[in-house]
Amino acid sequence: MPGNSFGKLFRVTTFGESHGPAVGVVIDGVPAGLPLTVEDIKFELEFRRPGRLYVSGRREKDEPEILSGIFNNRTTGSPIAVIVRNTDVISSFYEEIRYKPRPGHADLPFIMKYGYENWDYRGGGRASARETVGRVIAGAVAKKLLMLADTWIAGHLRSLGPEELNEEVTFEEVLCSKYSPVRASKKVLEEKYEALIKKATQEGDSYGGIAEVITKNPPIGLGEPVFDKMKAELAKAIMSIPAVTGFEYGLGFMVSKMKGSEANDEIIRKDNKIGWKYNYAGGILGGLTNGEDLIVRCAFKPTSSIRKPQKTIDLRNLEETYISVIGRHDPAVAIRGVTVVESMVALTLVDHAMRAGVIPLVKLTEEQGNIVQQRWERYVRSCKPMEESQL
């Protein structure tokens, strides 16, 4: 099964299955001298961890174990290997789907490709979103390394089901949405999202949503014409996330309804520098980052595992039947998905920053390491929850 690695210079390989002993990641290409601790990784992992309010009831602690690549809280330049053990596995929930593939899931395509006898039906196996633990671990490393360029990445849930954000949001609000149980950047939206989640849970159903990720101060010129354009690289990275069904940046599909005179973003002087008036392009022109905020959005489909009965085929007799999926599943996978999107944006940007020479390939100087650590600590402090009146 190829296709488990991502990136060229900053290369990430994830491994493990939902109900196997552990999931994990190997990160190759991290320069030596980057300050990095288990706590740095846990900070990001916490926001995709199950067992919290409004997400899957699977109670995993998600404690990362660093196996290699770090010594005295600094990267050594060798591959970084990290695992997270699966400690709350109940495979008995999945005995029924052993013979009844779930609608909306990868069950049947995996059986068709790899063979029924080779299919790990427990929790979805390799197709499970549990795989994204490795992405978030690598994303934490990438986010910290990007602090060398003072590049910050944060996301929020722009819509959930029929409810959506219809007003401007500040980057500070997006940062603080990490502590919203539904990743809302506004208090009024948080209440609407929570009501939807409660309704879906009661009905045995689920909702989809749109995640938006904003990158502040991205290095200029990232991306390589023609086939490695930044928009193409981000699209591939984000579309590889389980349950993601669509991608856009800037104005996205809205530009298809506009005239050129409306969609073109005028070039102006901003703070004694050349810039764009409205950033309609979302920070990418000609496939290159232009220094404006990098704004991407993606659509998550509703969680496929729902209690409502749905038609399927019993593989033992090839007769039509019904399945009601039991177990512990997210009523809206988009909530935890926001952190995964952040991670894939970070992995894409850090790889291109290294290719462009913005980040050193071999090692960080002691001064660079200290700068990174100071900025990282400021980032962590900035993610503290706002007072209710500020949300």
Swiss-Prot record:
Cellular component aspect of the GO annotation: cytosol
E.C. designation(s): 4.2.3.5
Record-linked InterPro entries: Chorismate_synth, Chorismate_synth_AroC_sf, Chorismate_synthase_CS
Protein's recorded name: Chorismate synthase
Originating species: Saccharolobus islandicus (strain L.S.2.15 / Lassen #1)
Function statement: This reaction introduces a second double bond into the aromatic ring system.
Organism taxonomic ancestry: Archaea, Thermoproteota, Thermoprotei, Sulfolobales, Sulfolobaceae
Keywords for this protein: Amino-acid biosynthesis, Aromatic amino acid biosynthesis, FAD, Flavoprotein, FMN, Lyase, NADP
Enzyme superclass (EC): lyase
Cofactors named for this entry: FMNH2
